[in-house]
Amino acid sequence: MGIKKYFPIICSIVILFMTAPSSRAGQIVTKETREWAQQMLQEEKSLQTAPARNTFAILYFKNRSGQADLDPLQKGMALMLITDLSTVKSVQVVERIKLQALAEELGLGASGLIEPGTEPRVGKLLSAQWLAGGEISGTQQSLLRVQSRLLETATSTIIGQPASEGMLAELFRIEKDLLFEFIKLLNLEVKPDEMAKLEKPCSKNSKALSALFRGVDASDRGDYEKAKDFYEKSLKEDPDICIAGEALQELQDLDLISVKKRSRDLVRSLRESTSLTNQLTPKEELKKKFYPNDIPTKTNVDVIFPLPPSTPPVKKTK
């Protein structure tokens, strides 16, 4: 009888352990992650526990612009937010690969886009107290607008709908606007050393970011050689960009790609030189005071994510 009495508590502890971020926070959906997602779906009806306290899951942002070239931002925006929030100790952020694995098990494919109305279900499966997602749109060439929505998973209550817009070259600033608004809405404690990390953008180079996002998507689709090429291109554009170096190293460690000397040298150089040269300048300092009336309403936008110009053929000289 004693075991029956404490069985619900034991189940809660097990589920919390399984849904907590692991020590290997990579970008590859492994066999173990897929098995976790399958088990969560199998046990969905028996999940009676409340969401894990201070746990935050960020879904992919849906591209509503009608421009396929902007699709890399769907995972890219979530990727940057997850990476930033993972440095804040007062909140537990669900790994991106767990969302990806769960979405695939739900039959949503490698895109990982959650169907409207199913967010609370996904939040429960991820054992997340809070859930955020959003849409990407725009009205003019190169003008970007990102509208997000922050939910309390258990009640589906909307906590806030922060938004930001700007030129495509300001993507790093747009992400930071949403980041600090989430922190404010959830009243998260951020220590000074954490704030210093949060103020550092993933990259200010739009080409580097585009390649990074495409690399992550290629990896999700199982095209690891293409992912490697995108990561290397990203690092070539900006050696200090976030995630790309670790993602490239992960592909090598898991023996998913053919390792060439160039790749080994690139990863080695990144290990030996850590730079903070991407720190925001005073002119780019982010505003951290927000007011409810300042939050823009949702609009539809058309934006084209710039592709790198094609290289002209080299003329042979006699």
Where are these regions (language model features)?
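C-terminal/domain-edge helix-coil "capping" segments
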Residues: A25-N54, Q141, A154, I158-K318
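Surface-exposed short loop/turn segments
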Residues: G112-R149, A154, L251, S258
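Bacterial N-terminal signal peptides
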Residues: I9-M18
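Short beta-strand->alpha-helix linker/helix-N-cap micro-motif
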Residues: T30-T33, K45-E119, L131-Q140, I159-G160, ...
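Bacterial N-terminal signal peptides that target proteins for export
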Residues: M1-I10
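Sec/Tat-exported extracytoplasmic proteins
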Residues: K62-S65, L81-L85, K89, L126, ...
